[in-house]
Structures are given as structure tokens and as C-alpha cells.
């Protein structure tokens, strides 16, 4: 499915779905509130996948961010959307996902990038665990580069240089419960 075909589910302030719009037309200087998801993907050792957004991205090109974000299609659960985007964006197999857990169910944010494009999303944050032996092969149109890092190193980098990371990642990681969930999954002995 291309951006031109992909639909985004629009929302009202109370979090109710109120319609859809083509993804290609939604992100502007006057972006309507819509549903999205954000995910932090961990390998079996608990290392965190961080990605650098492709330079061709409309918003925040070249910025380091969490593992993967996206938009659920109409009538699609966030878990199914995460699997779909994991396949299409990161080159994972549909069966790669051991566990998908919601950590910040009510997360929402509004941010404006330097070009004036606005992100305004109701965006539950998920922790995703991958099966042993899974490899990431990101699409170049989505991901410029990626790294698997110890979670505390990522937290330290975000705290020291927040301007290098997406505003939603910085904001999400300001929630102690997300950091704790990620740290609890880290097992360097695995």
C-alpha cells in the first residue's frame, strides 16, 4: 500500500474516530488530530532498535527516533498495524513478533518540525519483543540507518542531546513507566 492509498483515521479531542483521510494529504501545517502508534522494538537480549529517519521523509528527515511509528488503518488494531509496518518498513517477517505490549495507552502529542509540518497524534506507545534470529532490513525510503543499543545508552543520549532525536521520542522517554518497561526487558546474558 502506498502513501497515496493509505488512509489515516481522524479523531476528535475525546479520542473518537470521526472519519478518514489519505495519509498523503494529512501531514501539513494544519494537520488534523489522528490515530497513530509508536513502538520500541527489543531483540532477545533486550537491546533497543533505534532508527534514523530517511532523508526523504516529509517530517523530521534524518532525525534519530524510536524503532518504528505508523498509523493503524480503519478497523485495524495497533498490534496488527505494528506487524504490518514491521514487515513493510523494517523487512521483518510477520511471525517475528513474540510480544506486543501497550506501555503508554493514552499518549498523545503535537509537534511542529522546522518546515512547519505538524504531527498531531493520539499515539499509544508499545514495547515489542522480537523472536530469536530475526534481522532488520529497513526500506531506504523509511530508514536511513539503524542501531541496536543498550537501553540505558539510548536514554543517556536522549537526555544529553534531545535535539538529535524526534520530539515524540524525547517526550515518550520522559515517562518513567516506559523507561522501566524497556529496562526490565534488557538481559545482556540472553
Curated annotation (Swiss-Prot):
<dbReference type="GO" id="GO:0005737">
    <property type="term" value="C:cytoplasm"/>
</dbReference>
<keyword id="KW-0460">Magnesium</keyword>
<feature type="binding site">
    <location>
        <position position="71"/>
    </location>
    <ligand>
        <name>Mn(2+)</name>
    </ligand>
</feature>
<dbReference type="GO" id="GO:0046872">
    <property type="term" value="F:metal ion binding"/>
</dbReference>
<comment type="pathway">
    <text>Isoprenoid biosynthesis; dimethylallyl diphosphate biosynthesis; dimethylallyl diphosphate from isopentenyl diphosphate: step 1/1.</text>
</comment>
<keyword id="KW-0413">Isomerase</keyword>
<dbReference type="InterPro" id="IPR000086">
    <property type="entry name" value="NUDIX_hydrolase_dom"/>
</dbReference>
<dbReference type="GO" id="GO:0008299">
    <property type="term" value="P:isoprenoid biosynthetic process"/>
</dbReference>
<dbReference type="Pfam" id="PF00293">
    <property type="entry name" value="NUDIX"/>
</dbReference>
<keyword id="KW-0963">Cytoplasm</keyword>
<feature type="binding site">
    <location>
        <position position="89"/>
    </location>
    <ligand>
        <name>Mg(2+)</name>
    </ligand>
</feature>
<feature type="domain" description="Nudix hydrolase">
    <location>
        <begin position="32"/>
        <end position="171"/>
    </location>
</feature>
<dbReference type="InterPro" id="IPR011876">
    <property type="entry name" value="IsopentenylPP_isomerase_typ1"/>
</dbReference>
<feature type="active site">
    <location>
        <position position="121"/>
    </location>
</feature>
<dbReference type="InterPro" id="IPR015797">
    <property type="entry name" value="NUDIX_hydrolase-like_dom_sf"/>
</dbReference>
<keyword id="KW-0479">Metal-binding</keyword>
<feature type="active site">
    <location>
        <position position="69"/>
    </location>
</feature>
<dbReference type="GO" id="GO:0050992">
    <property type="term" value="P:dimethylallyl diphosphate biosynthetic process"/>
</dbReference>
<keyword id="KW-0464">Manganese</keyword>
<feature type="binding site">
    <location>
        <position position="69"/>
    </location>
    <ligand>
        <name>Mg(2+)</name>
    </ligand>
</feature>
<comment type="function">
    <text>Catalyzes the 1,3-allylic rearrangement of the homoallylic substrate isopentenyl (IPP) to its highly electrophilic allylic isomer, dimethylallyl diphosphate (DMAPP).</text>
</comment>
<feature type="binding site">
    <location>
        <position position="27"/>
    </location>
    <ligand>
        <name>Mn(2+)</name>
    </ligand>
</feature>
<dbReference type="InterPro" id="IPR056375">
    <property type="entry name" value="Idi_bact"/>
</dbReference>
<feature type="binding site">
    <location>
        <position position="119"/>
    </location>
    <ligand>
        <name>Mn(2+)</name>
    </ligand>
</feature>
<dbReference type="GO" id="GO:0004452">
    <property type="term" value="F:isopentenyl-diphosphate delta-isomerase activity"/>
</dbReference>
<feature type="binding site">
    <location>
        <position position="121"/>
    </location>
    <ligand>
        <name>Mn(2+)</name>
    </ligand>
</feature>
<comment type="similarity">
    <text>Belongs to the IPP isomerase type 1 family.</text>
</comment>
<keyword id="KW-0414">Isoprene biosynthesis</keyword>
<feature type="binding site">
    <location>
        <position position="34"/>
    </location>
    <ligand>
        <name>Mn(2+)</name>
    </ligand>
</feature>
<protein>
    <recommendedName>
        <fullName>Isopentenyl-diphosphate Delta-isomerase</fullName>
        <ecNumber>5.3.3.2</ecNumber>
    </recommendedName>
</protein>
